Amino acid sequence: MSIKAEEISSLIKQQLEHYDDKLDIEEVGVVTYVGDGIARAHGLNNVLSSELLQFDNGAYGIAQNLESNDVGIIILGKFDDIREGDRVKRTGRIMEVPVGDALIGRVVNPLGQPVDGLGEIKTDKTRPIESKAPGVMQRQSVNQPLQTGIKAIDALVPIGRGQRELVIGDRKTGKTSLAIDTILNQKGQDVICIYVSIGQKESTVRAQVETLKKLGAMDYTIVVEAGPSEPAPMLYIAPYSGIAMGEEFMYAGKDVLVVFDDLSKQAVAYRELSLLLRRPPGREAYPGDVFYLHSRLLERSAKLSKELGGGSLTALPVIQTEAGDISAYIPTNVISITDGQIFLQSDMFFSGTRPAIDAGASVSRVGGAAQIPAMKKVAGTLRTDLASYRELESFAQFGSDLDQATQAKLARGRRTVEVLKQPLHKPVAVEKQVVLLYALTHGFMDAVPVDDIARFEQELYTDFDANHADLLAEIKSTGKLPDENKLQEALQQFASSFSSSNK
């Protein structure tokens, strides 16, 4: 068999024509240490801060510490099968999560993967978890109310769309219930809600998801869950994932509410990671940049300018205090970042005043501008009246010889406290709140025994729904009080027909 030189040369020419000289260059490092959700790798000389890295087993990590000899990496997910000597490669991108309408109604983990057993989430849109907050000129002032349906908040510490309002209090004082009720009240308000659960018991989260489903709130809600059994990196990135999902809707011109429940546990997870990465500890062993941890998150909450679509992202961060100490490190940090705080007191909670909002310590720095005129008018003096009642109440314990005016103030104060109580998962529409508070401040409840106030409230709503729906509709559509003569006449008719249980 003779081999012809022409055939060989033509075959070589064919091979050269089809030769593809594209090379895939990967920068690969070697794992030198792994444990507690942390890995160290040698050889990643050009890696960028916060860059996403991939391990041999498919797990991802984020580059945190860039040192002269190695890189400190936080591992996202399980790290049991990562070994010393495994390879880790750069991806050239930062951590992203899936976003968009496909996530609404779903329960996902901080990586955007479904954990509700309802199948995969079909979306091709992603967003980086870290992004720059809108600048001063990209925002507008908060001017639209976000109704929580909770009388004590909408009247005393109103929240505007685009605001950051801290919910702070000891454990078991109703912080989560308050946030869930706010989500429930957004039904029909064209607000998309994102509930980020950080380190909450999985049984508790399950119960909350069932409540949201039962009351129809999952139709406009995304739940991001990082359970206590998850590694610390998952608890650390959960709030950033949640706000990235919200930003997608905000930049599309929609209104979004994001609840972070709670950021104390995220700070603890970040402290754990920082200590494992050998970063120097500071006050309460937190690292020096723990303020930046929360400020860069909450600054992404905004009311965008009209040029950018006018969307808004309202943040309700939750912080847990120890024995009511709001002067601890993390509480003071977050108080200074946010636009106000709602302080829940355990003494009030256990005495039966629920929601246990301490009107004296709670404040809303920008929400007042967003309050509807009708509510501003009826609730104007409510805070000072309540504060003077608390003061008088402590003096009244020492003697019974009180003048008529003081007794009247005490009687009005008791009724005010009773009016601001509210059962769980029963948000009240703002127009009904206005009518109720008008009745309180104009003396229509002065003759009603304190024990009958709750019944008076329910019967008042029923009466107005049946006989004065036009007045409620006017408050709802205009945001202003209707003709006061008509309103007073309607309240007078109802008050005279109301029978107290003492009779």
Curated annotation (Swiss-Prot):
Query: What Enzyme Commission number(s) appear in the record?
Result: 7.1.2.2
Residue positions binding ATP: G169, D170, R171, K172, T173, G174, K175, T176
The UniProt family comment states: Belongs to the ATPase alpha/beta chains family.
Q: Where does the record place the site Required for activity? A: S362
Which species is this record about?
Answer: Lactobacillus delbrueckii subsp. bulgaricus (strain ATCC 11842 / DSM 20081 / BCRC 10696 / JCM 1002 / NBRC 13953 / NCIMB 11778 / NCTC 12712 / WDCM 00102 / Lb 14)
Q: Which reaction does it catalyse?
A: ATP + H2O + 4 H(+)(in) = ADP + phosphate + 5 H(+)(out)
Among the GO molecular function terms of this UniProt record, one is: ADP binding
Q: Which InterPro entries match?
A: ATP_synth_asu-like_sf, ATP_synth_asu_C, ATP_synth_asu_C_sf, ATP_synth_F1_a_nt-bd_dom, ATP_synth_F1_asu, ATPase_a/bsu_AS, ATPase_F1/V1/A1_a/bsu_N, ATPase_F1/V1/A1_a/bsu_N_sf
Subunit note: F-type ATPases have 2 components, CF(1) - the catalytic core - and CF(0) - the membrane proton channel. CF(1) has five subunits: alpha(3), beta(3), gamma(1), delta(1), epsilon(1). CF(0) has three main subunits: a(1), b(2) and c(9-12). The alpha and beta chains form an alternating ring which encloses part of the gamma chain. CF(1) is attached to CF(0) by a central stalk formed by the gamma and epsilon chains, while a peripheral stalk is formed by the delta and b chains.
Say what the protein does. Produces ATP from ADP in the presence of a proton gradient across the membrane. The alpha chain is a regulatory subunit.
Q: Which GO terms describe its cellular component?
A: plasma membrane; proton-transporting ATP synthase complex
Q: Gene that codes for this?
A: atpA
Its membrane topology is listed as: Peripheral membrane protein
Per UniProt, subcellular location reads as: Cell membrane
Cite the Pfam families for this sequence: ATP-synt_ab (PF00006), ATP-synt_ab_C (PF00306), ATP-synt_ab_N (PF02874)
Key words, A-Z: ATP synthesis, ATP-binding, Cell membrane, CF(1), Hydrogen ion transport, Ion transport, Membrane, Nucleotide-binding, Translocase, Transport
* Uppermost EC category: translocase
What is the name of the protein in this document? ATP synthase subunit alpha
